[in-house]
């Protein structure tokens, strides 16, 4: 990894990576908190339908008022500061922006912004996973035709899962399953924005302090977000969904390889090369010990006994047969990690996950 040294070189040459961000909510604010501290990076513009909300979030994340006092995007380039406004189309059309980040959470808006990026030659990071699940493969194809990069957002679980799948395949492993953890119970699938924080087990003050959106938070525990994110993963990795969709089994970090393998091998999956989301709660509502609520995982298969023995010798999290083994990341940092996508695109010309076909979809049952 040498992204930091490349960013430092851009800073030394007074040629920072320039970003225009659309959507100043929770994800965007988390990115802004770290972007202010990142060498070689300039947030040239923050666009939001409510600019005052964006300014308040900039202040809350440690930005001094003079840092976002630019009167226009061109003024931001002259001063090295940040412009706050409400016109995404004008920002995307502006010269000097290297990368556009869509963090709106609005699928039609995200698709519209991505198409504008294709028209104006701007690389795009699609935080808006709802837009990606709906039209990502088409947007990625259009981006390729336009000579730009369309990328999933590092820090969000789909991109982190794509990274794990890529790691496994790049060293010759067959990927048996990949996915994430979440908080799931059948009885909380009926949650609404009015009662979501009761079911989310989050104190009301914590939710308010964190600017947690009740509608978005509901999607995290009613199954919606998990289905959308696994669709994004399938469309970007070639993994295919299970015949009956996601089952949210309660699984600990130490049980990944035992459970998340095909049923023919004693696991819970209907085939290898699929996705699954695991719950941090047992069906009685008690916590799974050593759960993976905020994390991601990949399960791989040993091709022969020699590799199985290596799994045992190096204390990997393997199943009883040592044929299957799991790797996991215990958490994801949302917007705090988004700078990896920005740096990877700008400095390597490489996306952090890109859809390349429609393999999955989301339905309500």
Regions found by a protein language model. Give the residues of each.
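N-terminal glycine-/serine-/threonine-rich beta1-alpha1-beta2 phosphate-ribose binding loop
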Residues: 1-116
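C-terminal catalytic/substrate-binding lobe primarily of soluble NAD(P)-dependent oxidoreductases
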Residues: 2-10, 202-365
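Glycine- and other small-residue-rich loops at beta-strand/loop junctions that grip anionic moieties
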Residues: 20, 24, 102-106, 127-132, ...
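Generic secondary-structure signature for well-ordered alpha-helical cores
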Residues: 36-40, 59, 63, 144-149, ...
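Short, ordered loop/turn segments at secondary-structure junctions
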Residues: 49-51, 89, 105, 129-132, ...
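Rossmann-fold NAD(P)-binding glycine/threonine-rich loop
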Residues: 108-120, 129-149, 153-156, 164-167
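A short hydrophobic/small-residue beta-strand
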Residues: 123-125
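Rossmann-like NAD(P)H-binding beta-loop-alpha module
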Residues: 143-144, 151-221
